[in-house]
Regions:
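Polyanion-binding surfaces on beta-sheet-dominated domains and ring/shell assemblies
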Residues: 1-169
């Protein structure tokens, strides 16, 4: 599936974009096929998957992989594969093994993105995300909008209330 490719590409492109970004992050899809975790399975291989997981994470300062997101689900043929063919049931131990199997892939992809950044990144720019709010600014906004907002918020009907708030903005 292309979701994992998109995740890795989005992180890599953000790494070199010049935007402030605390990446890289990366992800891997694993499929439990014939009792083995297969990374980045082809569509044809997924037919034999009992269970699939998508795991995303990043490398932390000590070099370990911190998992940030897990999506999991049974393969479409799981019932048949488990009960008719005797394939491995994805119990807690098996799924934990899949999470551990994902970590080396996440690490390698994150390291590749870090290398890409070294050779291709634009200079990181700083952007002010929010203006500094001062007591004077709060007081000025209160002076300008308080009475009108009090009046608008006292309107019981939703649509007229929303219209009045929109007018005030």
């Amino acid at each position: 599936a292309y979701d994992v490719v998109a995740l890795n590409a989005a992180s890599a492109s953000t790494m070199i974009s010049g935007l402030p970004f605390e990446g890289p992050v990366s992800g891997v899809r694993l499929a439990l096929i014939d009792g083995q975790w297969v990374a980045f399975p082809r569509w044809s291989e997924r037919e034999r998957a009992v269970f699939e997981i998508v795991v995303a994470g990043r490398v932390v300062e000590n070099g370990d992989v911190a998992i940030a997101m897990i999506e999991a689900g049974a393969g479409k043929n799981a019932w048949h594969l488990i009960y008719d063919e005797g394939q491995t049931k994805p119990d807690e131990e098996v799924v934990a093994g899949g999470l551990e199997a994902a970590k080396p892939f996440i690490k390698v992809i994150c390291e590749a993105q870090a290398e890409l950044k070294k050779i291709a990144a634009k200079e990181t720019k700083e952007f002010q995300l929010f203006p500094e709010y001062t007591e004077d600014l709060y007081n000025r906004i209160d002076e300008i909008a308080h009475a009108d907002l009090d009046e608008a918020l006292s309107i019981a009907e939703k649509l007229p209330r929303q219209d009045r708030i929109h007018e005030i903005k």
